[in-house]
Amino acid sequence: MSNNNSAIVSKVWAFCNTLRDDGVGYGDYLEQLTYLLFLKMAHEYSLPPHNRNLNIPKEYTWESLLQYSGEALEVHYSLMLRELGKSKGILGQIFAKSQNKIQDPAKLYKLIKMIDAEQWVMMGVKDKGDIYEGLLEKNAEDTKSGAGQYFTPRPLIKAMVACINPEPSKTIGDPACGTGGFFLAAYD
C-alpha cells in the first residue's frame, strides 16, 4: 500500500473511532462512507474530462451536500438518502432503505469535507481497493470490534496470483472473498 493510501486509511479510520464513541458502529460507518463516496465520485465523473450524466437529481448531488452545515445538513442528508432510495434503476438499488446513521451534524460535516478533499476518481482501482482493504484490516485488528475476520497478507496474495498466472480469457474465483484482495491482485 502506498504512503498516500496509508495516510488516507489512517485519517478515515481515526474518524471512524470518533464516530464509534458516539455509538456509530463500524458497519454503519462503512455504509455511510460508501454512500458519500458514491456521491462524490458521481460528482467527479460529471466534470470534464468525463462529462457523464448519472441522473442524480440536482437537489441530491454532492454539490448540494456542500451547501449545508449544522442541523440543516443532517436534515438534507437524511432526506437525500430517502429520496435517492426511491429512484428507479441502479440508483434506487444503491440507496434502497438507506438511512443517516451519523446524527451529529458537525461530524457529518467533517466526514463530507474529508471525502471532498480527495480526488477519488483519479485513484486507480488498486488504490481504492487497498484503502478499503486497509479499513477492513484495521477493523479486524481492533480488539473492541470482535469482527472475527481474517486477511491474507499482501505478499502471500501476490505469490499465489503469480503461481496461478491469470489471463484475460481465464475465469478465476475466490469463494472466501472478503476484501477482494485476490481479485484486485489478479486484475493488476
Residue ranges and their predicted role:
Residues 1-168:
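Non-catalytic, mostly N-terminal accessory regions of nucleic-acid modification and defense proteins
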Residues 179-188:
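Conserved SAM-binding loop of SAM-dependent methyltransferases across substrates and taxa
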Residues 146, 176-179:
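Short glycine/serine/threonine-biased micro-segments
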Residues 169-176:
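Conserved class I S-adenosyl-L-methionine
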